[in-house]
Amino acid sequence: LTYYTPDYQTKDTDILAAFRMTPQPGVPAEEAGAAVAAESSTGTWTTVWTDGLTSLDRYKGRCYDIEPVAGEENQYIAYVAYPLDLFEEGSVTNLFTSIVGNVFGFKALRALRLEDLRIPPAYSKTFIGPPHGIQVERDKLTKYGRPLLGCTIKPKLGLSAKNYGRAVYECLRGGLDFTKDDENVNSQPFMRWRDRFLSVAEALFKAQAETGEIKGHYLNATAGTCEEMMKRAIFARELGAPIVMHDYLTGGFTANTSLAYYCRDNGLLLHIHRAMHAVIDRQRNHGMHFRVLAKALRMSGGDHVHAGTVVGKLEGERDVTLGFVDLLRDDYIEKDRSRGVYFTQDWVSMPGVIPVASGGIHVWHMPALTEIFGDDSVLQFGGGTLGHPWGNAPGAVANRVALEACVQARNEGRDL
């Protein structure tokens, strides 16, 4: 039980974790909490003689508090503090390998979920963070005072590059700011990435010339190797595209951070899709909450990330969703358990990420979405644009008109 230290005073530089743990029957909570702290830091299953060659007091994780979860039988929140020295600077990969790498398969636990992490400024300052952030993006696009509008091109698979470009053009001409590759559009036999990039670029510039607005399409650079991913991002930049896209969980944090550095150095915005997140965050008592994945993404680098909708076809509770939306956008977020925020998080000067509301939303949801997400967001309507009975461009017009109306009503102080 050397890892259970209820009298420990946490330091400003400690990385703090809140685990929701369900011990096996007969295992005391303190023992389970100590086991989590040990296995995710310096411990192993037995005492080893080489422990004497280092200072465990300096390097060990400490379980410093355990509280039972109200209304749940045999479930606890265990708070663990990790010394900063345990982690490589600027590596989300290393952070996750340490904290969630091994401990989730632990025999003494029936289930374990990482609910939240407190990242101290001493650590967060070693990360690149979003390549550009919210303000720089608005300046690049010269679009202010309203949410941005996007649309995922459907059917997501099976279109030829030529027809894909046509769909993009229709949407952008109608008034959307962005269109998007679906997360699983990479480079398949029916549409190789280069053909898609070329026909999309043509559509972009045509729509820009017609509307006088800057347009973007999230060109998905996700690939089977980092080298191939960079090749696609470089080609997108050469075409003059303003934004590329990456699936950060399937692509991996290492690839994601490499891409973020490239995007910052070359003036590309980076849109992040969270494909595979529900595998990790859907279970209520095992895995990892999305707010942890959102914090990790803000450090690893991305200018947009999908963040649920509160009103569409995918799961998400309003307060909890708003909790991690604030964690993405704001500099300083107060601890608030009702919104699932277990720790006060101070991002200091790290730029914010724009949350993207996407998944089963349509024009009818517009008042709710403008109210819930506010101006710094991207509202993404896939079927909600392309499903318009008159076609893509009228669908885009409908969305833009609805958005402008809601923003005007809000600015006049009317209740949405």
Swiss-Prot record:
Its cofactor is Mg(2+). Its EC number is 4.1.1.39. Transmembrane segments: none annotated. The active site is at K154 (proton acceptor), H273 (proton acceptor). InterPro entries: RuBisCO (IPR033966), RuBisCo_large_chain_AS (IPR020878), RuBisCO_lsu_C (IPR000685), RuBisCO_lsu_C_sf (IPR036376), RuBisCO_lsu_fd_N (IPR017443), RuBisCO_lsu_N_sf (IPR036422). It is found in: Plastid, Chloroplast. It comes from the Eukaryota. The record marks K313 as: Transition state stabilizer. One of its GO terms (cellular component) is chloroplast. The modification N6-carboxylysine is found at K180. Substrate binds at N102, T152, K156, R274, H306, S358. It catalyses: 2 (2R)-3-phosphoglycerate + 2 H(+) = D-ribulose 1,5-bisphosphate + CO2 + H2O; D-ribulose 1,5-bisphosphate + O2 = 2-phosphoglycolate + (2R)-3-phosphoglycerate + 2 H(+). It holds the Pfam family RuBisCO_large. The disulfide bond which can form in the large chain dimeric partners within the hexadecamer appears to be associated with oxidative stress and protein turnover. Keywords: Calvin cycle, Carbon dioxide fixation, Chloroplast, Disulfide bond, Lyase, Magnesium, Metal-binding, Monooxygenase, Oxidoreductase, Photorespiration, Photosynthesis, Plastid. Mg(2+) binds at K180, D182, E183. One of its GO terms (molecular function) is ribulose-bisphosphate carboxylase activity. Binds 1 Mg(2+) ion per subunit. One of its GO terms (biological process) is reductive pentose-phosphate cycle. The basic functional RuBisCO is composed of a large chain homodimer in a 'head-to-tail' conformation. In form I RuBisCO this homodimer is arranged in a barrel-like tetramer with the small subunits forming a tetrameric 'cap' on each end of the 'barrel'. RuBisCO catalyzes two reactions: the carboxylation of D-ribulose 1,5-bisphosphate, the primary event in carbon dioxide fixation, as well as the oxidative fragmentation of the pentose substrate in the photorespiration process. Both reactions occur simultaneously and in competition at the same active site. Belongs to the RuBisCO large chain family. Type I subfamily. Heterohexadecamer of 8 large chains and 8 small chains; disulfide-linked. The disulfide link is formed within the large subunit homodimers. This is Ribulose bisphosphate carboxylase large chain. It comes from Arthropteris beckleri (Fern). The lineage of its organism: Eukaryota, Viridiplantae, Streptophyta, Embryophyta, Tracheophyta. The gene is rbcL.
